[in-house]
From Swiss-Prot:
The lineage of its organism: Eukaryota, Amoebozoa, Evosea, Eumycetozoa, Dictyostelia. The keyword Transcription regulation applies. Keywords: Chromatin regulator, DNA damage, DNA repair, Growth regulation, Nucleus, Transcription, Transcription regulation. It comes from Dictyostelium discoideum. InterPro entries: Chromo-like_dom_sf (IPR016197), MRG (IPR008676), MRG_C_sf (IPR038217), MRG_dom (IPR026541), MSL3_chromo-like (IPR053820). This is NuA4 complex subunit EAF3 homolog.
């Protein structure tokens, strides 16, 4: 017998190959497609935008229990592993394709570059102009031969009229020769410019290709339990219209200092963790806040203008930073050793957050007041 669910009940929902946390918004007693006795449920996926709200049948819903959360964890890990393998295969295929393209750069350009298609059209146009110039030269040579004969005949008849005609004709032909020579020179210059443009564009393409290959991205794997904390945090702020009680204790600075103290790691690791603190201070106001939190942040800036954000905010916002880091960290020309040090430091922080989540992620939220709601809606 299928479970029944009530409005506002927190549940787990099968969606594609994963299981997500959701909330029952409405219960429709009308019949479903598969069984006339089963109701439909209108659900909201926690952490998702409202456009993803949908009516689903009860066979896709699970009660929010510890047993089902374990099932969610196993299912999502399996899905993530499958997705990661697919990405690796896709990446490998792209690398093979890039190697083939490097071996045959001209063939690659002609098949895949819109710029090169335009360039080939320019080159064809230049060829047509050159042919037209050739026809003019042949006509000139024929005219010159005829003119030479006329001038020789005029030498025998020293008539002023014929001499004037010959001189005028000779002057006209000379001007035509000069004009055609200028046209040919212009065409040659255009062809040279086109060739230079082609070479420059190919150099830029080669530069882009080498830059792409030298670019390294750092992948950060956030544990599922911490992802659930992110979802709960999002739901409290955006659905329940609550704000975190600040300042937090422990704050971000306390957390990072404690990690350094407990791990007693190398100076390089300490440097990275201290760098995380500095990055947090700079990124919080622009990257880590939900719109609903903006009035609270503005108030903090007014009342504590000299305080660092790492002295005020806590684990919730530090965790948000790690969600953003893969998008922000594009590392070029770094040794593998340096990249490994970065990843090791990030993993240490995430492990600490997961291990101490029961004391760091306390649900210390306050329902927003009416003036605050008004200020948030006007932002």
């Amino acid at each position: 017998m299928d479970e029944t669910y009530e409005e506002n009940e927190k549940v787990l929902v099968h969606h594609q190959n994963r299981i997500y946390e959701a909330k029952i918004i409405k219960v429709d007693p009308k019949t479903s497609k598969s069984d006339k006795k089963k109701p439909l449920y209108f659900i909201h996926y926690l952490g998702w935008k409202e456009k993803w709200n949908e009516w689903i049948e009860p066979n896709k819903i699970l009660k929010y229990t510890d047993k089902n959360r374990e099932l969610q964890k196993r299912t999502n890990i399996k899905a993530s592993t499958t997705s990661l393998n697919n990405k690796k295969n896709t990446k490998k295929a792209k690398e093979v394709k890039q190697q083939q393209q490097q071996q045959q750069p001209i063939a690659y350009d002609s098949e895949n570059s819109d710029e090169d298609e335009n360039e080939s059209e320019l080159e064809d146009g230049g060829g047509e102009d050159a042919d037209e110039g050739g026809e003019d030269i042949e006509d000139q040579e024929n005219n010159n031969n005829n003119d030479t004969g006329g001038e020789e005949a005029d030498d025998n008849n020293t008539s002023p009229r014929s001499t004037g005609s010959s001189s005028s004709s000779s002057s006209s032909k000379s001007n035509n020769n000069n004009n055609n020579n200028n046209n040919n020179n212009n065409n040659n210059n255009n062809n040279n410019n086109n060739n230079n443009n082609n070479n420059n564009k190919r150099k830029r393409n080669d530069s882009k290709s080498s830059h792409f290959q030298s670019t390294k991205f750092i992948d950060i794997e956030i544990p599922l339990s911490l992802k659930n904390k992110l979802v709960d945090d999002w739901n409290s702020i955006n659905n329940e219209k609550s704000i975190l009680s600040l300042p937090k204790s422990p704050n971000v600075k306390d957390i990072l200092n404690k990690i350094i103290e407990e791990n007693d790691k190398s100076s390089e690791c300490k440097e990275v963790i201290n760098g995380i603190k500095q990055y947090f201070n700079k990124a919080l106001g622009t990257l880590l806040l939900y719109k609903f939190e903006r009035p609270q942040y503005d108030s903090i800036l007014k009342t504590n203008p000299k305080k660092s954000m790492s002295d005020i905010y806590g684990a919730e916002h530090l965790l948000r930073l790690f969600v953003k880091l893969p998008q922000l960290l594009v590392i070029s020309n770094l040794e593998e050793k340096t990249i490994t040090q970065l990843k090791d430091a990030f993993e240490i922080v995430l492990e600490y957050l997961e291990k101490n989540s029961s004391t760091l992620f306390l649900k210390e939220y306050t329902i927003a007041s009416s003036p605050y709601l008004k200020a948030a809606s006007s932002n």
